[in-house]
Structures are given as structure tokens and as C-alpha cells.
């Protein structure tokens, strides 16, 4: 492992914190603070993502070694690593929250692979930093498993995301109050190694504008363009304008992907928005079970539902507006910023329409297809239909319906038998109209099935499935975590031997903590 090459441009090229103390404080005029991971008692590898390890240059023998667990548990460093925590702020639930920063995430370094790709390796749960505020800098096994699995699940679904290399248990208890209701309890501790080209967020830019530090703001903007958007050229004004436009475009495509797979992030604060258009910071996330566009998995958001499924594209645009506000002082004319925001809306509308058409098997979408799609979502919500299983069942619809009813064709997608029976005729009428319309565009049922199954996953990481793996791992059995890691690598392929993992949410999980609603406790 000592042959790995690190080139830590973030700390080499951006101003750092001159104060070496690892004490909670306001950090001014700096993009980062040097900080060492805090060692743990007994680092032990629980799981590793083999394709991420191979991408980074780690062999199976290396990932199985005690040295690997020590490094990625926070007890050792490799040559060339130069750990840091980043300074950023953010808008949380619509309100400016001031300095936030990496309170328990410590970046080890920027690894450059033999292919020339640059990957930042970041430990989450590696101990306190100057940005930890009142927290301990640690993470529990429960939330670490969720982040580890979801990072990889999203990648294999084709959704832009940070990756996860490893999950290491620490041997140390971490006290958390799961529901913030005054009942703290010790839980097993863990450290996840997250991997991305960059972990820079919208909030990294916001903090400097809020502090009127335009010098550091300009340095960060120009550094980000040079390192992470090297294809953008022109003079400084043109580069900055093109960069913001591309950030808007990437964010629009990210939102379309979330809507496609039924993913709800849960905490779309500006400090959780990647400048690269990646899904970042997996906390109280969830996938839709029954189709409910007003659903959010986050207990903190249960009343206002700011970050509900249907609202995510609008929130992303609001967050881009906050980013535009942050970088506006660098523009003599803010017209390019408004153009970028407009571009977000244009890109999202076109891509979202194409995505919806593809989910329903259409090659193109006109007024008739529009009406069918709108009616389908209304029925799915009214009848309490499982989002993921509905689209897979639709893809499996036979070439000829004959006299088959929607209940027969759709099968086990219903959560409420009474609602199913009440609306059976309406569902069948819709199904027949859809079958005629899609048949005009894709007359061959096998071709249609292949196309629909390519965009509608068979497997998504449902909260209740993840929670079962968490419960087992907490009791000392990591086999379910490792099984899920294998299954999620082929989310569009039917894996009959693992059919239990794609069952619609069981009734016992409807209101169970960790299965339906989650807090930010981690």
C-alpha cells in the first residue's frame, strides 16, 4: 500500500488554518484545517467494496490485511497522506446556519491512480475536528452501514454519487439519542471511508461570502474549476459563468435520477449539495415504498416536509440560487448566474419528461402519453401501490392482455386489498389504454420489457431491508451486509434466489424506527 501516490491539491493550493489546535472554534480565512484521525481501540474490517478497492489500486490481499483496517479505521496513515477537515457553512431547512464544516469527516488525501484518476479518500466517524461543535466526531455502526451500502447502491443504479471503500468497526461504544427524545444509549462505533473526486459542497463557497472573504472565495472557485472542471476554458469571467452553468446542469440530471428510482435524500441542505452533482451525505434517506409524493423519511422534517420526494427538484433549484448568491460578488454582471438557473429548469424539464416516458416504455411522449402518465401516478397514490414493483410489473406485461385484469397483471404491488378491489376497474381501464399506446411505439413486448427493465430497477435498498442487516450486524453477524453489497451490484437483473429482498415493505415495518422514518442521529 505504500506504493500508492497521493497529490493533495486541496491543501497544497488553498489557504489553510494557521492554528494547529484541534479545538472546536470558528475558523477564519481558511478552506481547511489540518487534523489527525483519533485512534480507536480495535479496528476491524466489516466490509469492503471490491470494485472500489480495485479502482483505487488495492489488491484483495491488501484489503484483508490488518494495516488496511488500521488505516481506514483511523489508526495509521500511508505515506503521502495529509489529513484535513474542510471549512464550510450552509443553509439548513432554509435558514443560514453559519459555520458547519467537517465535524466528523477527515479527508486522508487525494489518491491518484495509475489511470490518472484523482480520488479523495475521506473517513467519516474518525474523531473530532475544529468543526465538531458539540459533537464527538464519531459515527455509529447503524448509520455507517446505511452510508456504506447506499453509496454503492446508488452507483450501481446509475445515479451520480460518492462511493464507499470500506466499513470498519472500532470496538468503541458511541452514545446516541436515536429519536432525539431524551433516551441516549451506547451503540457500536464504526468508520466509513468515502470516496469521490471532490467533497466540495455549495456550503464551501457560502461561508466565505457570509464572512465577506472574497479573496478566499475567488481562490476556491478558480481552484475548483481548474481541478474538477479542467475542460472549461476562456478568460476568468467566462470560466466562472460556464462552471456555474455546468453545476446547474449536473444538479438537474441528479434530480431526475433521484425521481427515477424513487430516492428521497431527506436532508437537502446546501452543505449536503455536491458541486460535482453527486449524491452526498447519506443520512435519513429512503426509497419510496408505496407511492406518496409527499413522503419524507426524516423525522426532523415530519411537519414541514420541506424535503419530500416531490419537492426535491424545486429545493435543488433553491439551493442553486443560494450558490449563485454566494458567488455573485465575483461577477461584474450577474446575467450568467440567472442564465444558469434558467438552464437548470430547462434541462430538468426535458430530462424529466424523457425519464418518465422511458419508465412507462414510451419512446416519445406526446399529450396522450402525458395524460396516461399523469393518471398512472394519481392511481398509484390513491390505491397505495408500491413504486418500484409497479414499474417492474408493468415491464413484464404480456404481449396480449386478453381479458386479464390489472390486479392479475400487476400482481403483488398493492399495500391495501380494499383499495385494490375498490379501484380495480379504473386500474384495468388504465392498463388497457397504456397497453395500446405503448404497443404503437414498441410493438415487440420483449424489446419493450428490456428497455423498461433497464431504467426500472428490480432491487432498491429499502429501509426495512437495510435495518434487518443493521440489526444482524449489531448482534455480531455481518453476513447480511455483505449479501446486500453483492445483490445491489446488479439492481436491474432479476435475482430469484434473493426475491425476499425486493418484497414490498411488510406491515411490521410501516412505523418501525429505521424502516419508515429516521432521524439525523448518526
Swiss-Prot record:
What EC designation does it have? 2.7.7.-, 2.7.7.108
Question: What positions constitute the catalytic site?
Answer: 271
Lineage top rank: taxon: Bacteria
Residues holding ATP:
101, 103-104, 124, 136-137, 194, 201, 281
Family annotation (Pfam families) = SelO
Q: Sorted alphabetically, which keywords does the UniProt record give?
A: ATP-binding, Magnesium, Manganese, Metal-binding, Nucleotide-binding, Nucleotidyltransferase, Transferase
Is Cell division one of the keywords UniProt gives this record? Answer: no
Q: What InterPro entries is this protein classified in?
A: SelO
Cofactor(s) named in the record: Mg(2+); Mn(2+)
Name the chemical reaction catalysed here: L-seryl-[protein] + ATP = 3-O-(5'-adenylyl)-L-seryl-[protein] + diphosphate; L-threonyl-[protein] + ATP = 3-O-(5'-adenylyl)-L-threonyl-[protein] + diphosphate; L-tyrosyl-[protein] + ATP = O-(5'-adenylyl)-L-tyrosyl-[protein] + diphosphate; L-histidyl-[protein] + UTP = N(tele)-(5'-uridylyl)-L-histidyl-[protein] + diphosphate
Recall the GO molecular function terms of this protein's record. AMPylase activity; ATP binding; magnesium ion binding
Residues binding Mg(2+) are 272, 281
**Record family assignment:** Belongs to the SELO family.
- According to its UniProt entry, what is the function of this protein? Nucleotidyltransferase involved in the post-translational modification of proteins. It can catalyze the addition of adenosine monophosphate (AMP) or uridine monophosphate (UMP) to a protein, resulting in modifications known as AMPylation and UMPylation.
> What is this protein's record name?
Protein nucleotidyltransferase YdiU
* Organism, as annotated: Gemmatimonas aurantiaca (strain DSM 14586 / JCM 11422 / NBRC 100505 / T-27)
Amino acid at each position: 500500500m505504500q506504493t500508492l501516490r497521493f497529490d493533495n491539491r486541496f491543501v497544497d493550493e488553498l489557504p489553510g488554518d494557521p492554528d494547529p489546535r484541534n479545538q472546536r472554534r470558528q475558523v477564519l480565512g481558511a478552506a481547511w484545517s489540518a487534523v489527525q484521525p483519533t485512534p480507536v481501540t480495535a479496528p476491524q474490517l466489516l466490509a469492503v467494496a471490491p470494485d472500489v478497492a480495485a479502482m483505487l489500486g488495492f489488491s484483495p490481499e491488501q484489503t484483508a490485511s490488518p494495516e488496511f483496517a488500521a488505516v481506514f479505521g483511523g489508526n495509521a496513515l500511508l505515506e503521502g497522506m495529509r489529513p484535513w477537515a474542510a471549512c464550510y457553512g450552509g443553509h439548513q431547512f432554509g435558514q443560514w446556519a453559519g459555520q458547519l464544516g467537517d465535524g466528523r469527516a477527515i479527508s486522508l488525501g487525494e489518491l491518484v491512480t495509475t489511470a490518472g484518476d484523482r480520488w479523495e479518500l475521506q473517513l467519516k466517524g474518525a474523531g473530532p475536528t475544529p468543526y465538531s461543535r458539540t459533537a464527538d466526531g464519531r459515527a455509529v455502526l447503524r448509520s455507517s452501514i446505511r452510508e456504506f451500502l447506499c453509496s454503492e447502491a446508488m452507483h450501481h443504479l446509475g445515479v451520480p454519487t460518492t462511493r464507499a471503500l470500506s466499513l470498519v468497526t472500532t470496538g468503541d461504544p458511541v452514545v446516541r439519542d436515536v429519536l432525539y427524545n431524551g433516551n441516549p444509549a451506547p451503540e457500536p462505533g464504526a468508520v466509513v471511508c468515502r470516496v469521490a473526486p471532490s467533497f466540495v459542497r455549495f456550503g464551501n463557497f457560502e461561508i466565505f461570502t457570509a464572512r465577506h472573504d472574497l479573496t478566499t472565495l475567488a481562490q476556491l472557485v478558480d481552484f475548483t474549476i481548474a481541478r474538477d472542471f479542467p475542460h472549461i476554458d476562456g478568460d476568468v469571467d467566462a470560466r466562472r459563468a460556464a462552471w456555474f452553468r455546468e453545476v446547474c446542469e449536473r444538479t438537474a440530471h441528479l434530480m431526475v435520477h433521484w425521481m427515477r428510482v424513487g430516492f428521497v435524500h431527506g436532508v437537502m441542505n446546501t452543505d449536503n449539495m455536491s458541486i460535482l452533482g453527486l449524491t452526498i451525505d447519506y443520512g435519513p434517506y429512503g426509497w419510496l415504498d408505496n407511492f406518496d409524493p409527499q413522503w419524507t423519511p426524516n423525522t426532523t422534517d415530519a411537519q414541514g416536509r420541506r424535503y419530500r420526494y416531490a419537492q426535491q427538484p424545486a429545493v435543488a433549484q433553491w439551493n442553486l440560487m443560494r450558490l449563485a448568491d454566494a458567488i455573485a460578488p465575483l461577477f461584474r454582471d450577474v446575467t450568467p448566474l440567472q442564465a444558469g438557473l434558467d438552464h437548470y429548469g430547462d434541462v430538468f424539464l426535458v430530462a424529466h419528461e424523457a425519464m418518465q416516458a422511458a419508465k412507462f416504455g414510451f419512446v416519445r411522449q406526446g399529450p396522450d402519453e402525458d395524460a396516461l402518465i399523469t393518471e398512472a401516478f394519481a392511481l398509484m397514490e390513491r390505491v397505495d401501490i408500491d413504486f418500484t414493483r409497479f414499474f417492474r410489473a408493468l415491464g413484464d406485461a404480456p404481449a396480449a392482455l386478453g381479458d386479464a385484469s390489472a390486479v392479475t397483471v400487476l400482481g403483488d404491488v398493492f399495500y391495501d386489498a380494499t383499495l385494490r378491489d375498490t379501484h380495480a376497474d379504473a386500474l384495468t381501464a388504465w392498463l388497457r389504454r397504456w397497453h395500446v399506446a405503448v404497443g404503437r411505439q414498441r410493438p415487440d413486448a420483449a424489446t419493450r420489457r428490456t428497455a423498461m427493465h433497464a431504467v426500472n430497477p428490480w432491487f432498491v435498498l429499502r429501509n426495512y431491508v437495510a435495518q434487518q442487516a443493521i440489526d444482524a450486524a449489531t448482534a455480531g453477524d455481518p453476513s447480511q451486509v455483505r449479501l446486500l453489497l453483492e445483490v445491489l451490484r446488479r439492481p436491474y437483473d432479476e435475482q430469484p434466489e434473493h426475491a425476499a429482498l425486493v418484497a414490498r415493505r411488510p406491515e411490521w415495518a410501516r412505523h418501525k424506527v429505521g424502516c419508515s422514518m429516521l432521524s439525523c442521529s448518526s
